[in-house]
Amino acid sequence: MRKERPGVLFNKIRSYFICPGCNCLPDWPVTLPCGGTVCRKCFRNAYSSESSGKVSPSRCCFYNHKKPHYSVETEVKDVIISKVVELIKTTEFQISQQSLVPLELKEEICHDDCLSSSPPCTSALTEITLLPPTFHNLIPSSSSYETAVAEFLHMEDLLQENVSRELECQICFGMLYDPVVSPCGHTFCGPCLMQALTQSPQCPTCRFGLPSPVVLEHAKSHSITTFLRDFYPDNWLERQKSWEEEKEQESWLPLFISMLAYPRMPTFLHIFELRYHIMIKKCLETSKRFCIAMPLRARSDGHNEHRELRNARGQRLFCSEYGTILEIIQVEPLIDGRSLVEARGSYCVRIIDFRADGLFPRVKIEKHYDTPLRATPLQFPEPEYLLMYGNLSNEELVERIDAFYMNARRTYVHWVVPLIDIKMEARQSIADLSYKITNLLPISELEKTRILQVDNPTDRLVLVLIWLTQLQESWWYRVGSACTIA
């Protein structure tokens, strides 16, 4: 049996999940964008405007953070913490149902115990003071004291076991590491969720649309993190070490200089060179991932708009600075020695270093996630056009792009129209719409690499509209007008 006094473990577990505003277990826990958790009542008091009753993100939270939470808009229940709170309350109720007697009998019980104990009653009184606040008015009867204490300790151990079982990631089914709370209230390991978002921008549990990983990285649950670090430090350090090794391994990937690929879109490759056969084989043995980038080609005037990459060792790499991580789905060997590789884009990357010593180059990458921040004109590939279209909303941009293609379908240039429904694709994923349109645009592939540099979905739509405008201006007739031949 544990040597710890009854009530200590219960109070310790309970302390991790209480609301800092009212110092009580939250009936409806709300996790803030900073990772702190409060009850719904305290949330409304802190973030609601007194005049309108609407949520106002102008105040800071109870965790003494200096910056206000500009993204606080809803009071979605934190699913995992609500389950943990329910377990704590259930255990609290079960303990209260033990055969206990009122505090008024304390002196009588202590007197009976003192007849055969020395020193008199000291340990019993100390244990009583350490019981949870709910039980301070109760004391075990002297006849069944040891049994009551044993039951109490067993319930505490069972509570810890049940809480740890709830704190499991629904992606890797392991204990949570670096837990991130999604806007829909579900919690996952940070690395697992970031990995899942490369396949689909939806919650793995409820399919709710999720924001950019850059936003989610800040929503790490403070309560769950501190609980797991304190109760399971060895497991936490093991997961941390494993993730750092995996991250270091992922940061250096084989590079295939071939073509342009896009995130969350299928890509098919014909592999016939021996060195790339070896590269694909090595990828299949490890993470099944590699980086693909567009090769540089000189323009007709002999100059190159994109300069080659150089590293500290003086080596040069003739490819674009931005590429895409492809994940191999399957490899089909053909009878003529080639291999047909089916892959899918995961996310955009920026090449920050490379090694060109072996059969194929290996590159160190930096993930290029979407952000909610809009680009400034100086950061945008076409600054003068950004000033023209930069103030348009997503809906207005989609309307203009759709109008262009609707007009094109009625002319002799219907062949430039992508075989997709613009508005339907926008409803499904506004972040991927620009990639799907760019993939089918009749412009230079090297020019298309600009889309990988833009990390805001709205700015990407602006860039697509710029390309459509330039494309229309370069034609010898206007879309929507009659074709005349002199």
Curated annotation (Swiss-Prot):
InterPro entries: Lon_prtase_N (IPR003111), Lon_prtase_N_sf (IPR046336), PUA-like_sf (IPR015947), Znf_RING (IPR001841), Znf_RING/FYVE/PHD (IPR013083), Znf_RING_CS (IPR017907). PROSITE patterns: LON_N (PS51787), ZF_RING_1 (PS00518), ZF_RING_2 (PS50089). Residues 250-472 form the Lon N-terminal domain. This is LON peptidase N-terminal domain and RING finger protein C14F5.10c. SUPFAM superfamilies: PUA domain-like, RING/U-box. The keyword Ligase does not apply. It comes from the Eukaryota. The keyword RNA-binding does not apply. One of its GO terms (cellular component) is cytosol. Keywords: Metal-binding, Zinc, Zinc-finger. Gene3D superfamilies: LON domain-like (2.30.130.40), Zinc/RING finger domain, C3HC4 (zinc finger) (3.30.40.10). Transmembrane segments: none annotated. One of its GO terms (molecular function) is zinc ion binding. A zinc finger (RING-type) spans 169-207. The lineage of its organism: Eukaryota, Fungi, Dikarya, Ascomycota, Taphrinomycotina. Pfam families: LON_substr_bdg, zf-C3HC4_2.
